[in-house]
Amino acid sequence: MSSYGGGYQRESRGDSYRSRGGHDGGYQNGNGYSGGGGYGGGYGNGYGRGGGAAGGDRMSNLGAGLKKQDWDLDTLPKFEKSFYKEHPDVAARSEREVEEFRKKHEMTVQGRNVPRPVENFDEAGFPQYVLSEVKAQGFERPTAIQSQGWPMALSGRDVVGIAETGSGKTLTYCLPAIVHINAQPLLAPGDGPIVLILAPTRELAVQIQTEISKFGKSSRIRNTCVYGGVPKGPQIRDLSRGVEVCIATPGRLIDMLEAGRTNLRRVTYLVLDEADRMLDMGFEPQIRKIISQIRPDRQTCMWSATWPKEVRQLATDFLNDYIQVNIGSMDLSANHRITQIVEVVSDFEKRDKMIKHLEKIMENRGNKCLIFTGTKRIADEITRFLRQDGWPALSIHGDKQQQERDWVLNEFKTGKSPIMVATDVASRGIDVRDITHVLNYDYPNNSEDYIHRIGRTGRAGAKGTAITFFTTENSKQARDLVTILTEAKQQIDPRLAEMVRYSGGGGGHGGYGRWGGRGGRGGGRGRGGSYTASNAAPLGNARRW
């Protein structure tokens, strides 16, 4: 028997399962679990080793080696997932007060018996070990998504949450996950995780891990982050030792499952974070294969910034009798705290206009600017150009090694390099609270990505500015963009309005203007070690910042 902080003893498990709980009566399981069939053994054969994807499209073949699971719910060990007990203050509110609170915070709820929102942390009914950590982080009150999302997730129901990026949704599912874990049997050797969180990018996965690590400390909850682009060894070690929480990108998780490095038979709390983005990136087949390996009576929480038909279909297929909360408009809309400036330009004007904006933005040394490009090549070329012109810019995209990406993100977060150039794939995982400006050097492929990009600024109640270069090549998107700008009461460039009237075809051939040449492949050394050419380019003599 070994003691773990937080006022309870962690029992070694004999023939019966013991609850991890015991902090605060409300969440203790107390039923005991018969050791009988258990979770152990058995799983090994469930995961074939799969012969890889030789000669075919690797992405489409991912998961081909996973065996179909036949779930007999009668023989599976029972588990606890309903923990919510309504606070007397919440119960005492009239229906009218509840409706007024929801209206004030732009909440729309759907589904059967949706619990009422909570207005402060104490009303959520979290155990003290969770509450004290929340308060230690300095949060004053729950965000809108947390007010409604916590009672929903703690109730054990399947949940859909739609809210803008930066709304606090990570804690909305992380804190109930900790409560859920503490009510489950301890892991036995060979057991997989209890909580699985799927995310679209490495950066977002790491950000989620940071959050859950803070709040899981007092319960000694172990977690690991499983994503591509780094060696598998440390991830395999973590999984083999046993973790209660696995945060993963779909591709690398399937690799681990096919190789028999872990299994999902113990997963009873599944989170799909940024579901819309995962589908945009083509992960739907992998998500479906992963979910097929998880017991069907699990609790599933799906979080998304938008609610397109593809995400609705995923919810219909994998969630049971779900309840839904939407913060803000159900239509595609931008954060109203962001000032949106759209300039109709030609490709060859972009460079000079970018410099003019940066000169103004960087007058305030506390500002941070995130620049989005359409391709990795353009990201590198712009970064090289800016550095040679004396601007402290660094780039981040999918081709860069994880070590370099982490270094770039840290340089940006700390303000050492206040200009970061990124592609869409990197954008969703970037969680930097104090980005003041977003500059869309290239307009994205769709309006959802535009919303996500500009949502990197104006987070946590702050104001932000988004500057967008729009060319005739983008004219097919003009109507959607004008709709977004109009809804947010933004000024509209007359040339953009004109495009809506005459749109239908794209513009000219839309080359990259002065950026047409191929970037060099030089190695070079940056301050953080050996990095790719653009980030290693020396800063020009005429320092601009």
Curated annotation (Swiss-Prot):
EC top class named in words: hydrolase
Domain of life of the native organism: Eukaryota
Domain Helicase ATP-binding: 150-325
Subcellular localization: Cytoplasm; Nucleus
Domain called Helicase C-terminal: residue spans: 353-500
E.C. no: 3.6.4.13
Molecular function terms, GO-annotated: ATP binding; ATP hydrolysis activity; RNA binding; RNA helicase activity
Chain location of the short sequence motif DEAD box per the record: 273-276
Motif (Q motif): 119-147
Pfam assignment, any one: Helicase_C
Known partners and oligomeric status: Associates with polysomes.
Family label: Belongs to the DEAD box helicase family. DDX5/DBP2 subfamily.
Protein name in the entry: ATP-dependent RNA helicase dbp2
Originating organism: Neosartorya fischeri (strain ATCC 1020 / DSM 3700 / CBS 544.65 / FGSC A1164 / JCM 1740 / NRRL 181 / WB 181) (Aspergillus fischerianus)
